[in-house]
Amino acid sequence: MHLDINEYLSVPNMINYQGQYCGTDSPGKSSCSLRDFKEYPIQDFDYKFNSWGFRAEDFEQYLGDKVNICLGDSITVNIGGPVEHSWCSQLAEHFDIPTLNLGMSAAGNDAIKLVYSRACDIFDVQNTFVMYSYLHRRLINGEFICDIHEDNENF
């Protein structure tokens, strides 16, 4: 079965979306800066994404089946680490049914809700786990907005 990526879970422009550092995402404004990672161990892993743009095996085999889903932003994708170390992969070890990682880098909560709705249409979702994102990330008129505008037009 062939699925059009735009018809199902994909969110427009997300696969190639490259967000900018914004307010609280900025390394200089985080609780620990880049200098704190000087001794962080280098890990050897590859980023592999399926045909739908998610960091997992292809999902076609699960269409209509009972699954759990994990939703969120780059923390769910586990950017910076092997997929086996993601919270979704760790959680999957406690279930007898597949647990799908539907994390998207730079996703806002409205994009997460959009993916949730589409996932419920094509899978028999049993449990949903969400790592909510920053509130300033928005999907406005089909475009992902990451920056906080001084006039608060994102809100």
Label the model's feature ranges:
Residues 1-69, 122, 126, 131-155:
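N-terminal secretory targeting modules
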Residues 48-110, 114-118:
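Serine-esterase "nucleophile elbow" of acetyl-processing enzymes
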